[in-house]
């Protein structure tokens, strides 16, 4: 087999994309940067955009009170609550963001307890996948309003780092929060029962 070698100038051998990149240095980037994983870390969470006036006004129009709006730290945090479609109300004398998608009559597969029965006993209801609804302190202070979130909304997709500043010591006393959770769910159960008596649910 005979191989012929043709001389090629350096310019002809360079691909057109490389030439374009060379002519537009301000619009190119190091390809190695694309391989680096992107994710919100505790170290870069301070770069999150703060809650804008526009978002604050929108949430206020949706009924969010100042106690909740003042506790929301960033646009990303507000987006978590909006995407969860939480509604503002008062629970146990404190502002809260509650879920509207809880099936109070849904029973768990193990004990046959309904979500409403669980709540009456001070335990969290279960979501559609059978996972416990979690409570989050908006603003991470003991007196902060609470938000009802699924585990995924609370901790997945970078939400854990958006919602929790782990670079400082938590102000939440876990034992006190355990009692607060129990009282919260009992109060929510009472609200649901009252609404049912009034014919609203």
Language model segments and positions:
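Nuclease and nuclease-like effector domains acting on nucleic acids or nucleotide cofactors
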Residues: 2-133, 139-201
């Amino acid at each position: 087999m005979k191989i012929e070698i043709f001389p090629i100038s350096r310019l002809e051998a360079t691909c057109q994309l490389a030439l374009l990149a060379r002519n537009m240095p301000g619009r190119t980037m190091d390809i190695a940067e694309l391989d680096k994983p992107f994710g919100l870390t505790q170290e870069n969470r301070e770069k999150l955009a703060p809650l804008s006036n526009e978002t604050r006004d929108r949430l206020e129009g949706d009924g969010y009170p100042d106690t909740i709006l003042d506790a929301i730290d960033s646009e990303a945090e507000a987006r978590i609550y909006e995407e969860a479609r939480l509604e503002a109300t008062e629970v146990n004398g404190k502002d809260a963001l509650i879920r509207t998608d809880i099936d109070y009559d849904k029973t768990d597969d193990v004990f046959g307890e309904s979500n409403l029965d669980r709540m009456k006993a001070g335990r969290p209801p279960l979501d559609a996948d059978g996972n416990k609804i979690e409570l989050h302190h908006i603003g991470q202070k003991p007196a902060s309003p609470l938000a009802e979130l699924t585990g995924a909304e609370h901790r997945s997709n970078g939400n854990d780092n958006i919602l929790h500043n782990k670079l400082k010591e938590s102000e939440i006393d876990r034992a006190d929060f355990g009692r607060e959770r129990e009282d919260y769910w009992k109060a929510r159960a009472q609200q649901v029962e009252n609404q049912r008596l009034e014919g609203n649910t």
